[in-house]
């Protein structure tokens, strides 16, 4: 008598192609698919995988965080690679000179990087400059920085839970008859 093996959970849950209809993103996917296949470098495979990701999994990286990572002495003259958006940070007073490759850079962040004597590359320019990812630093923003993530975890009210409850309002005595002070 045979064993009935259940294959219900066998699928691997990850994207194998880009979901977006953006033609420019699809062109980049074509390019990095080629590079990942033809070069024996892990860098291109990682870039390709990150290009497939949803926007939630490609969080923005602030200019101050980028500067902090690139200021390390071992990263002198390297290109910062961000598969996502680089945003401005007004708390950062002085932007260091650096080379950055990103999918998108906000207007003010772009102006500040260029004013500091840095350069901003697109991913097709990066493919020409560093086809195997030599002299590059792969960076990404914090995925758990979203406000929505605060609501995830053990139920609010459970012991040692720091999960934020979903409430519309806070602090008013909502039961009827309300106190005169809240009228």
UniProtKB/Swiss-Prot annotation:
GO terms for cellular component: cytosolic large ribosomal subunit. It is found in: Cytoplasm. GO terms for molecular function: RNA binding; structural constituent of ribosome. Its main location: cytoplasm. GO terms for biological process: translation. Keywords: Cytoplasm, Ribonucleoprotein, Ribosomal protein. This is Large ribosomal subunit protein eL18. It comes from Spodoptera frugiperda.
């Amino acid at each position: 008598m045979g064993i009935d093996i259940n294959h219900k959970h066998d699928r691997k849950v990850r994207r194998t192609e880009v979901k977006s209809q953006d033609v420019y993103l699809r062109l980049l996917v074509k390019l990095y698919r080629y590079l990942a296949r033809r070069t024996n470098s892990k860098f291109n495979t990682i870039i390709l995988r990150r290009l497939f990701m949803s926007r939630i999994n490609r969080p923005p990286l602030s200019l101050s965080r980028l500067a902090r990572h690139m200021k390390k002495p071992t990263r002198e003259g390297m290109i910062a690679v961000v598969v996502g958006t680089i945003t401005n940070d007004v708390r950062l007073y002085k932007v260091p000179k650096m080379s950055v490759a990103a999918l998108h850079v906000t207007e003010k962040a772009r102006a500040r990087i260029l004013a500091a004597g840095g350069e901003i590359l697109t991913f097709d320019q990066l493919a020409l400059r560093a086809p195997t990812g030599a002299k590059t630093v792969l960076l990404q923003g914090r995925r758990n920085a979203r406000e929505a993530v605060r609501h995830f975890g053990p139920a609010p009210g459970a012991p040692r839970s720091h999960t934020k409850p979903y409430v519309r309002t806070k602090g008013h005595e909502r039961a009827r008859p309300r106190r005169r002070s809240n009228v």
